[in-house]
Amino acid sequence: MTHLRLDEMIARMRVAREAGSAHEASPEQLQRLRELARDCPAFTPNLLELARLLRLTDEPGVDMEQALAEIERLLEQAVQASGRSAPALLELAHFTDVFRDSPGLAEALFEESAASALRALENSWAGLIDFWTLERTNDTLEKALKLGELAERVFPESPRILHVVEDAREKAARAGLLPRNED
């Protein structure tokens, strides 16, 4: 079995989007998205979009529980295929809370989603502070210092944040933007 290339998956998803609306799917749009999910069950953007559209669309001849079961399966598949990404976990958490009346599971999914998003934010901020620090212009050093202050408040225990902020402060002091620490 040959696997679809990424550009093919994106093109098929674009064609499916053009066959309907973002707020209520056409039968052709749902068919195209389902075919893509069948052909590439790990393509998370399609799984999430199909699940979202199914929640917004009343399909003729499909009872509510049947639709909810398909949506739940798609969301669980998206969570698994995405390596438990924050967006997929968040969608499953909302679904579980609203449609499955399972507050304990919903809470755990919301917490896992938040923790995943925070890890991504911490790493993104550390990378951005480091990038700006390495640019070594007054403007980028000032941006690094400003973001560093926020990052330290949000992630006070993060060794990575503490390291890049300390480096930014050292370079800013050498550039005359901060008083030098004379140890």
Residue ranges of model-derived segments:
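Long amphipathic alpha-helical scaffold regions
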Residues: 74, 112-121
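Amphipathic alpha-helical repeat scaffolds of TPR domains
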Residues: 2-18, 39-60, 83-98, 120-134, ...
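Terminal, low-structured helical/coil segments at or just beyond the last alpha-helical repeat
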Residues: 1-4, 139-183
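Helix-adjacent hinge/juxtasegments
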Residues: 64-88
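Alpha-solenoid helical repeat scaffolds
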Residues: 30-34, 69, 76, 111, ...
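Short coil/turn connectors between adjacent alpha-helices in alpha-solenoid helical repeat scaffolds
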Residues: 15-25, 55-68, 96-106, 132-143, ...
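Structural marker of alpha-solenoid helical repeat scaffolds
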Residues: 39, 81, 115-117, 154
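Short amphipathic alpha-helical segments that mediate assembly, nucleic-acid/protein binding
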Residues: 6, 26-30, 141
